[in-house]
Amino acid sequence: MRKKLIGLSIATALGIMSLTACKSQPAENASTNGAADTTAQAEGTKEEGTSKEASGDRVKLEIWDWWGDGQYKYVIEQLCQNFNESQDTYEVVHVNYPWGDVWTKALAATAAGNPPDVIIQDIRTVTHRAEAKQATDLTDLIAKEGDGFTDQFYPQLMDAMMYDGHAYGLPYVTDTRILYYDKDAFAEAGLDPEAPPETWAQLVEYARKLDVKKDNGSYERLGFFPGTLEWNAWAFTADGKDYTDADGNVYVNTPEKVKMFENIYNDFYQYYGKKELDSFSAEFGNGMTNPFVAGKVAMWVNTPTEFTKVRDYAPDKNYGVALLPALEEGGEQYSWGGGFSVEIPYGAKDTEGSWEFVKFITSKESQIYWASEVYDTVANIEASQDPSLMDIPVFKMALEAMPTTVVTQDRLTAPGASDIVLPYLDEIILGNKTPQEALDEAQASVEQLVQDSK
C-alpha cells in the first residue's frame, strides 16, 4: 500500500516553485508568481482585499492566494468584484498571505475543518492534495456542466487535475519557455535576424558567432548561456518526458536526456570553462542588469512574461522570440512549464458557491482579462488565443509552444523526484561525472524512490 504523505503537498510545492518560480515575474510593478514582493508582508498576516464584504443575505466566500500587491492583487480583486456584481447570492472576498505561507495555513485550516472556500494552488501537486483529502472532488460538479466542459482547457493542464479518474481542480494559469534573441546582434554577426536556431547544433553555431570578447580575453557578450533555464527543465525539453509517470515508470537516463547534458557540458561548460561562466553570470540580475536587457547574452531562454523586462528597461531593443531548439534535426521543439490550479479545499462550507466562482474565474472572459493585465499564459484555450492578445508577439509564440510543452507533475509514485535528480545534474556541470554516469545513478535513485513509495 502506498505510504501516505499527507504533509508533502506543501513541502513539495515550495521546493518545486524554486524550480519553476512556476514561474516567472511578469512585471516589475506587479506582485509576482513567486515570493519576491509578497514576502514584504508580515509573516502570517492575513490581508483581506478591497472587494466588498458580504452584505444582506449573501454568503461570504474567501479566495486565498499570495497576490498581496501590484497588478496581480488589482486584477484578482477586480475579478472578485465582477463576480459579485454578476449575481446576488454570493460575495467573494480576496484574502492573501505571503508566498508559501498561504499553503501552510490552508493545510492547517483544512485539517481543522475551517478551510478557505477557494484557493490558488501549485498545479504540480494536485494529486497529493487529492489523496490526502485536502481538495474537493469536482467530478460531479463538472458533469453537471455537460459534455466537453473540460475541453476548454489545455489537455496537459487538465491531466494534472486528475487523481484516480476524478478531477480535483481546474487549471488557472500556466507557462512555457521560449527563446529570446537579439536581432541586431544577429545582423552584426552575419546571421539572418528572421531565422533563429531550430536545433541544438544551430544554437551552438550561432552562439559562437555571437560571442564578443574584450581585449583582456574575457567575454563582453555570450551568444548563449544555458544556465538561465533550470537543469531539470533542460532534461524535460530533451525528450518531452517527465522523470516519472503515473504508473511509476522512470525516464531519467533516456538517451535524449543523456545527449542533452553532453551538449550542455561539452558545448558550454567545458568549452568556456565553468569558472569563466560563473564569473560572467555573477553579474546577472533583474531590471537593468537582466542579462538580455543589458546585452550580456544574445540569446536567452525564459517565460513569455519576461518580455516585460525588455519592454520596461530596454524599450528600443530589437528582438525576436522563437521555440526552443530541438535536440536533433527533425526532432520536436519541446518546452517545459508549470502553473497554478484553482481548487476548492475539502470541507469548504458552500461547495456550490465556490464552484460558481471557480467557473467564473476560469471562463473565457475572465481569463482574457487576466492575460491582458498580467501577461500570464492562461489555461483556457480560447482565451489564450483571443485576437486581442495577439498584438504581443510573446503570446503568439506561447501558443505555438503549448502543444509541445511538458507540464511536469510531482507524482505520488515518486514524490520529490526532481529534487533527487538535481544534485546528479550538478555533478555533470561540475565535471565530476559524465552525463551517462550521473543519469544512470539518478535513474537508480528514482527507481528506489518508486519502490519506497508503494
Positions of PLM-derived features:
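Extracytoplasmic/periplasmic solute-binding protein
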Residues: 164-172, 177, 187, 201-259, ...
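Hinge/lid segment of periplasmic solute-binding proteins
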Residues: 48, 53, 98, 123-178, ...
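Extracytoplasmic "Venus flytrap"/periplasmic binding protein-like
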Residues: 82-156, 162, 188-190, 195-198, ...
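Short, solvent-exposed loop/beta-turn-alpha elements that line the ligand-binding surface or hinge
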Residues: 53, 139-153, 196-198, 214-223, ...
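Conserved C-terminal helix/tail region of periplasmic/extracytoplasmic solute-binding proteins
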Residues: 52, 187-188, 193, 212, ...
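Glycine-centered hinge/linker elements that transmit conformational signals in sensory
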Residues: 206-208, 249-279, 324
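Extracytoplasmic/periplasmic substrate-recognition and gating elements
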Residues: 59, 81, 85-86, 91, ...
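Long, aromatic- and glycine/proline-rich binding clefts that accommodate carbohydrate-like moieties
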Residues: 156, 160, 315, 322, ...
